[in-house]
Curated annotation (Swiss-Prot):
This is U17-barytoxin-Tl1d. It comes from Trittame loki. One of its GO terms (molecular function) is sodium channel inhibitor activity. It is found in: Secreted. The keyword Repeat does not apply.
Amino acid sequence: MKTIIVFLSLLVLATKFGDANEGVNQEQMKEVIQNEFREDFLNEMAAMSLLQQLEAIESTLLEKEADRNSRQKRCLGENVPCGDFPCCGKLACEKTFGYGWWYKSPFCVKPSKG
């Protein structure tokens, strides 16, 4: 009988002080959860900014690669009438004496020196 009274008194004391600590524990848990969410949010924001920076770098690299691998636009060869289309490479669109009088248009020729 004495042991039952001791256990019951311990039970009452434990429940009384347990309830008092429960409110403190809940507040601490709320603070911990808020801090974790805050840290997760900051980590997510840092990851998003890093992702945006990587995407910007990737887009510039892809543009450079596309420019490097792209074909030369269509152009006209030597001794071909030019007008709408540009002449290839080192050729220039000039009026010449040889073909100009017949076709009445400039031709792609090598530029004259001098």
